Amino acid sequence: MPAVMPMTTVTDIRTITRTPMIDALRLMAWLSPTYPVGAFAYSHGLEWAVECGDVRDAATLSDWLADVLEWGAGRNDMILCAAAHRATEAGDDAGLAEINDLALALAPSRELHLETSQQGRSFLDATLRAWPCPALSTVADRLNAEVAYPVAVGAAAGAHGVARAATVAAYGLAFVQNLVSAALRVAPVGQSAGTTILAALTPRVAALAEALHEAGLDALGSATLRLDLGSFRHETQYSRIFRS
């Protein structure tokens, strides 16, 4: 019997994907609050949630945002963004058009349809002007006048060769940031609380992006019925500052 027993060492190997600096900067610019898409005008139903008492403070805002991100449009938009990126990379113009039609059809109300289509068209037009490339011009020619926002972002990133996972993560974080910004204007929540909520939700965005950047369209689905109904009621809300 040997005096020294053989030992087996198990090493946990992890693959780290790094986004090139120029691509990271491009995503930061595209999804910046200063990008001319009009994101400041939309609250995605948050204004009604405040009006009816669903969002009353930082805790209820955090819960509301987490639900929208993980069970509502946040999750679906990340899937659609990834699908548009994949179709653009493959040169599948027909597939991209179908993804766009589906994305527009998923908007449950007139206001949420306007929110995604107006921002999508504005994003595509601005990106074509500032970051032109033949692949993106081809995409723009093939799509309808109405372009869903996540489809526009995914297609632009695919046309420019920006990594899909990074694109989906950046889109998801921008989705949450825009809603936190809206909350600061309409909910009893201050900047410190808003920043804390954003920090708490960032790991969830990263986890969703990791899980969804390769997901197919069959993964689409939502469970935010109260928000969807609220988007209808917002249309006739007596006093409001947002378009959704």
From Swiss-Prot:
Keywords carried by this UniProt record: Chaperone, Cytoplasm, Nickel insertion
Main localization category: cytoplasm
Annotated localization: Cytoplasm
Cellular component terms per the entry's GO annotation: cytoplasm
Highest taxon, organism lineage: Bacteria
Molecular function (Gene Ontology), one example: nickel cation binding
Record text on subunit structure and interactions: UreD, UreF and UreG form a complex that acts as a GTP-hydrolysis-dependent molecular chaperone, activating the urease apoprotein by helping to assemble the nickel containing metallocenter of UreC. The UreE protein probably delivers the nickel.
Similarity section: Belongs to the UreF family.
Biological role stated in the UniProt entry: Required for maturation of urease via the functional incorporation of the urease nickel metallocenter.
Protein name in the entry: Urease accessory protein UreF
The organism's taxonomic lineage, starting at the top: Bacteria, Pseudomonadati, Pseudomonadota, Alphaproteobacteria, Hyphomicrobiales
